[in-house]
């Protein structure tokens, strides 16, 4: 640990009497934001005493229109009150009502530390950073699980206050409180308490519960009941108390099956002014800000020196020592007395070297004691060091729920050990009668991206431990907690889903195959579930290290030329589910609907429990059905095109016997091009940016209906090979049909479109472009004549049916074809029954060519009604284009047998909108939840 500077060392000690509003006189420290020199309000006075949690307010002169962060109203006049630490701006009249804590003390107020899941950089319009409270005018990060937005250089200072979405054996509670997130509400948001506007698009104002969505002013939120009931979607949410995942060796990205992005580090920032700070990664300052000011590079301990990450602080050349120390501490949001720290100069020779040399420089004091004068060509560089302490006040938190007690404070000295601290605090928590040997002290590092727990040995000297933490990073010390916890033997258990294996093998064969590919350890790895048809297994792993090894190895392993898929799955405690709980299992195809699929994926993770939202490109629908296999009642939402819906329904049919709820109802959010099934079930022609919350409410209110599914057996004739006189036999093929099956011209058009999309997939990202390609392909076939009726034979219910002169034969199960066209028509006909999706009948329709198909699309004509039945046999006399639900191919000569699949599937049809009475108050969450925005770069 750095001690006082030796003779000849240049230091800025944090001595002297602190002025009012300084770190010593205020309960909080921090930086004043990302302001450029001269861009912020002009400071006109000394800091005033702060009654708000941790803020250090200063009266400033306003030079541009400014809004209050509490009431979100415009600040009239020239004077406002700005927190030097977090940029919180307030009216003078609002100061006494400020409840929002300052950024620098926010980590100490976190109830249960949970790390965030930051995705890729994106542009988020009219959003604000929760750390510095400034707008996100540059690419920024957002959490994939909660509504936290943050600048890249502010990420290290964000709290680990994400939603707790499962139990992990630590801090497990059955009762959940509101999880408040400040700001980024729409301008029309209304407070749940006073019914006045609480949102703003100009500043970070108002709060919203991440679970139930209730919105309120920060002042009014204290009037609400602390317990959260999950709001309007409570019956659809998978309760966190009913999900268990021991994720010791896995990141949050692994736990929620979110693709990992770049490792976040401090990025380049803006130059600071008057104690404000900006982040740098070895970036030099281009020019001096003012002749009367100097810019300093400030490092925080050995860790930032090793990574060559610093923050720039600009102060007056006439600044007192304590003022420079305060500015340096504010730059890193350090909420401690500046008299306990000093600044040590770093030599110019090390600054011009590489990051590795700079990291080594932080290990010895002799190397950092060289002089670095203000006249150097680069800004002066200093490192924050903690002065030696003979004793400290340490906060100890209970690892169990203790009503009315968040922590206790005790004094530790050089004689204090982890065991002595445990013995001292247990009586303070009311556990004095219990065996103290069963308790241990746990150190918890609460960074924004990872929460690390370390069990301290009984003989660990705590004062030395704190010294080592501060030597590494002073900011890290403020993000470190100590918990007293009962030592419990946790039995490791991790469920790993492994897909991409060869189908049709036995459990023993799969076990042997995995052992050959990944050298699994039989003592701790066993196959718990086998899905032979899909070529997938679920492994039970009773060793955390082995589970992590298998997970990382499987993602880089291929078996029989196919890459494996590995997912970490939690356990759903189905016996703990509330009686009225019917959770929604969500499948999203991010490739559908352009970027809308990706945005919906993020939105549903935030509205529901992210464990119940699955990305279909990462393992398909099988992992989701396995996770919900023991849930007695659940529903399904499929976000994608008709092909995606068919994919999920096929997986449901294959796994039905494994499910405790064998017939879940399925809703659709159409993202494809045609979306015929979505149209029939009233979900619309395609998703056009509706509020995701409103979509979930519609799913909850939807009506259950039955729908027929059909099995098509494709049995090709034997093919004679003229080269070697060998008879080749194409094996029979079985496909499932939900919407329609086309033979002839419509399948040929679909095949041409499919081939064009495979050649240039990047161009097929919008429905408008896709339909344009269909039109162009159709025009090319307008003079085509095939005489399909001469090339096929049709039997309906064992009876031969004579076909008229047609080019296409279509079997339809739903009254929508080709993006909403009514191919059967609405005219009544005594020969046929009125079609329904659950009548057990298929309608057979013919088309005479591309022109006829265009007329049907335009509503000018209908198709040629040929037959209606439940069993069909089609004989193909030559190779013919065939398509089923939009998937085309060339079918060899042979037979096609179409028959009903039992049982019928349960679908959800959107309820008709009821007319709203004039003046009726709408649901707050429905009105005010912002639509997803932000495009990944």
Swiss-Prot record:
Summarize tissue expression: Widely expressed with higher expression in the brain and, to a lesser extent, in the small intestine, duodenum, and liver. In brain, expressed in gray matter. Expression is most intense in the cerebellar cortex and hippocampus, while moderate expression is seen in the olfactory bulb neuronal layers and brain stem nuclei. In the cerebellar cortex, equally expressed in both the Purkinje cell somata and the granule cells.
Which keywords has UniProt assigned to this entry? ATP-binding, Cell membrane, Cytoplasm, Cytoskeleton, Kinase, Lipid metabolism, Membrane, Metal-binding, Nucleotide-binding, Nucleus, Phosphoprotein, Repeat, Synapse, Transferase, Zinc, Zinc-finger
Q: Where are the zinc fingers (Phorbol-ester/DAG-type)?
A: 54-102, 115-162, 177-228
Q: How is it modified after translation?
A: Phosphorylated by PRKCE and PRKCH in vitro.
Q: What top-tier enzyme class does this entry carry?
A: transferase
Q: Which Gene Ontology molecular function entries are recorded, alphabetically?
A: ATP binding; ATP-dependent diacylglycerol kinase activity; DNA-binding transcription factor binding; kinase binding; phospholipase binding; transmembrane receptor protein tyrosine kinase activator activity; zinc ion binding
Protein name per Swiss-Prot or TrEMBL: Diacylglycerol kinase theta
Task: Write down the species.
Answer: Rattus norvegicus
Lineage here is: Eukaryota, Metazoa, Chordata, Craniata, Vertebrata
